Amino acid sequence: MASETVSNHQEKALALLQADAEKILRLIKVQMDHLTMPQCPLYEEVLDTQMFGLSREVDFAVRLGLIAEEQGKAMLGELERELSALHEAFTNKQQ
């Protein structure tokens, strides 16, 4: 029974983290669709805050043993790649 509970908590933790990552990804996608200026202080503040918050959530879940460190790194890495693509797309638009 205890291992079933742990497994359930692990699944819930991963689902919650993925939901938070999806929210950030949607924000990035909206910016990509409109190619609004990523250097906008408000935009940067929101994304930085969201990314920092998610990184803390991931760290907490890893430390509790709810997700593997590799899962957390992969989740954050995907978002960082999307952010890089947004910045690159905006830079290309400016040229």
UniProtKB/Swiss-Prot annotation:
Quote the Gene3D superfamilies the UniProt record gives.
Answer: SO2669-like
A Pfam family of the record is: DUF1507
Whose protein is this, by species? Bacillus thuringiensis (strain Al Hakam)
What name does UniProt use for this protein?
UPF0358 protein BALH_3577
Cite the InterPro entries for this sequence. Answer: UPF0358, UPF0358_sf
Member of which family? Belongs to the UPF0358 family.
Domain of life here?
Bacteria
